[in-house]
Amino acid sequence: MMARRDPTSWAKRLVRAQTLQKQRRAPVGPRAPPPDEEDPRLKCKNCGAFGHTARSTRCPMKCWKAALVPATLGKKEGKENLKPWKPRVEANPGPLNKDKGEKEERPRQQDPQRKALLHMFSGKPPEKPLPNGKGSTEPSDYLRVASGPMPVHTTSKRPRLDPVLADRSATEMSGRGSVLASLSPLRKASLSSSSSLGPKERQTGAAADMPQPAVRHQGREPLLVVKPTHSRPEGDCREVPQAASKTHGLLQAARPQAQDKRPAVTSQPCPPAATHSLGLGSNLSFGPGAKRPAQAPIQACLNFPKKPRLGPFQIPESAIQGGELGAPENLQPPPAATELGPSTSPQMGRRTPAQVPSVDRQPPHSRPCLPTAQACTMSHHPAASHDGAQPLRVLFRRLENGRWSSSLLAAPSFHSPEKPGAFLAQSPHVSEKSEAPCVRVPPSVLYEDLQVSSSSEDSDSDLE
C-alpha cells in the first residue's frame, strides 16, 4: 500500500505549492508587516521613517506599489473664514457709520450758506448745478474768490529803470570783473558806460573807489588803460602806445602798486586763444611788490604762455635803481646776446636817463598771473660792428638768491656823433657804474647761469 502512490494526488500537491509560491512573490495588495519587523528604534536611511531599515520591504523607496498615498484630513469649517465681510443692516448702523454720516451731512448743510455769502461779497450770480447732480464748485473754491481787490501780477513785463541808474549799475558791474572773463562782456560794459553817460554824469555818477576801464577805438592801435586811483598817484601810470600784432592778444589784468618804493614795470599781454585774430593790444602798468592783489578789476588771459618774449621794439621799461643790489659782474657780455641791430639803435639813442630799460631776472613770486621777468629779444647778428657804431653795453648783477639781473647801459653816441657827451652828462650815475672796478666772468659761464635762471622762472611760473 505504501509503495503504491496515486499520481493524481501528487500532481495536485505540486500545483498547489507552485501557486502559493507565486502568491508570496507577487502580493496583490498591501500586507500588514509581521510584528517582529516593527522596531521603533530603527530608522530608515532612505525615507527617514522609524520602524524599519533600508533593507526592509516596508520602505516605500524600494516598493512604490506598496506605498500608501497620504489621505487628506477632513475640512475644519470653524477655523476658516469663508465670508470675511458681511454688510451691516442700515437699521442698526455701527458707531463708525454714524460719525461718517454726520460728517457728510454737515458740509451739505453749509453749502447754501456759503454760496449766499459769496454771492453777497463778490456780486456774481450763483452757478447753476450740472445736470448729473454734481456741483461745479470744489471745496477750495471759496479761497480762490477774494472779497478785496486782487493783486496784479506782471511777471512778463519788468519795470524799466532810469537810464542813468541802469548805466551806473552797468558801470559798477563792469568794475567787478572776474578773473576769467571773455571779450564781449567787458566791451559791452565799457561801451555802455562811455557812450550813455553825459558830461555831467561822468563827473558825478562814476564811482570814486572803483577804477573805470576805457576802451579806445580810434586809429589802428586800440589800447586799454587802467588807472587805479586809490592806491597810487596818476604820475606813476604811464601810457605808452604799442603796435597791435597777432602775437599779442587782448587784456591782461592791472594790479595796483602796493609798495611805491619799487619802480613800475610795463608788461605785455599774453595772447588768448579766442581773441587771437582780433589783434587788440593792451598797455597796462602794475606794481611788482604786492603779495596779495588789491581790490581792483583783474582781467586775466585765458591761455598763459610758458615763456612770453618781447620784440625788439617792445622793451619793458623800469628804473635802473632796481638793479643796485650787488656789484657789477660784467660790463660787456657776449655780442650774440647783448648787441642790438641797426633797427633798434635810434630808439635807444633818444631815451632819457629815466627811460633806460632794464630787465629783471628775478622770478615774480607775488604775481601768479602776469610774469614781469621777461627777456628782451635782441638781434643775434653783430650788425653794429660793420656800421661803425659801438655795441650796446649790458650790466649783469648777481643777486643774493643766486639769480642774475641785467640792465641796459646806453653807449656814448649812436646816431648823434656831434653830441658825444650829451647822454653822459645827463646820466652821471651810469658812467660811474661803468668806471667802477668789476670782476671779469667768462661769457660761457654767464650765459649758462642765465639759462638756468630762465628755466627756474618757467618752473616757478608753472607751479604758481
Swiss-Prot record:
What ranges does the record list as Low complexity composition bias?
A: 180-197
Span list, region Disordered? 1-42, 70-389, 411-437
Compositional bias, Basic and acidic residues, is annotated for 74-89, 97-114
What InterPro entries does the database record attribute to this sequence?
A: FAM90 (IPR039213), Znf-CCHC_6 (IPR041670)
**Homology family:** Belongs to the FAM90 family.
Which PANTHER family does this entry report, sorted A to Z? FAMILY WITH SEQUENCE SIMILARITY 90 MEMBER A11, PSEUDOGENE-RELATED (PTHR16035:SF14), PROTEIN FAM90A1 (PTHR16035)
Name used for this protein in its record: Protein FAM90A14
Q: Can you name the source organism? A: Homo sapiens
